[in-house]
Design a protein with these regions (language model features):
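Active-site-proximal alpha-helical scaffold in enzymes
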Residues: 56-59, 63-66, 139-151
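Flexible, low-complexity linker and terminal segments
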Residues: 2-4, 141, 146-260
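Active-site/ligand-binding-proximal alpha/beta "capping" segment
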Residues: 125-147
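Thiamine diphosphate
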Residues: 1-120, 125-126, 131-132
């Protein structure tokens, strides 16, 4: 995650996800390469609801952000996942699977949560679910997850499992130079009448960040117009739903076929 430009991660301790965050805490400042310093802030929150809320809030400031959890914690994140979806906020949720349901077998391996990740949250909104098969895939897939979150302005759920989380393996040396960073339509300046949710042919609007001059925007959990103001107008509702769903076409085009 540090190599991929992640600058904020929140978590609430849960097996088997905690190992990742604890490792990141130990290496919050790590020289990745000559032009890329790690410097990632890790925050342990009071619960999983706070964890995803802080990750989404960090993303609003323009930094790459993530949170990490397992099945029971992801259940608690579902509502804020939808909030990120309707507000088109990029965030990466790393879901380390274990055996369920409920507490299940908290220290045992499981791969039960694919459909849950695909369908979590009420209503319809686009998201990307990436499932990695081994440690090496996990490294490079993480870069894809952050890029796709930024490019399409959607939540990305990266599915791993206890085996990947807890294993010590011998593999090829990771190559940070193969990790590219694409921030998508993140603005560095905004002029005139800025519309955070402006209609566009690909469904992806220019994205401001908190504190950007002339880039004021509004976020609520309600349907909104192009500026972000609450709207219950049925025509606007259809337009906004269509706008968000347009991203699916773009995702299917850009995500490599071998990954689908």
């Amino acid at each position: 995650k540090m190599v991929c430009g992640c600058r904020f991660q929140s978590y609430y301790p849960i097996t088997p996800a905690s190992d990742e965050s604890e490792f990141l805490e130990t290496h919050e400042i790590l020289q990745i390469k000559e032009d890329r310093l790690g410097s990632t802030t890790i925050v342990q929150t009071e619960d999983e609801i706070s964890a995803i809320g802080m990750a989404v809030g960090a993303s609003l400031t323009g930094v790459r952000s993530a949170t990490s959890t397992s099945g029971p914690g992801f259940s608690l994140m579902a509502e804020t996942l939808g909030w990120a979806g309707i507000n088109e906020i990029p965030v990466v949720i790393t879901l380390f699977q274990r055996s369920g349901p409920s507490t299940g077998l908290p220290t045992r391996h499981g791969q039960d949560d694919l459909l849950f990740a695909i369908n979590a949250g009420h209503g319809e909104f686009p998201r990307i679910v990436y499932a990695s098969g081994d440690v090496e895939d996990s490294f490079y897939d993480t870069g894809k997850c952050f890029n796709f979150a930024d490019i399409f302005q959607v939540p990305v759920i990266h599915i791993l499992d206890k085996f990947i989380a807890s294993s010590v393996v011998t593999c090829k040396r990771f190559e940070p130079d193969l990790i590219s960073i694409d921030r998508g339509k993140l603005l560095e300046k905004a002029d005139g009448d800025y519309k955070r949710f402006a209609h566009s042919p690909d469904g992806i609007s220019p994205r401001s960040k908190l504190g950007l001059e002339n880039g004021v925007f509004w976020n609520t959990g309600d349907e909104s117009d192009e500026h972000g103001h609450i709207s219950e107008d049925p025509v606007n509702r259809i337009q906004m739903m269509d706008k968000r769903q347009k991203k699916v076409e773009q995702i299917l085009t850009l995500v490599p076929k071998n990954d689908q």
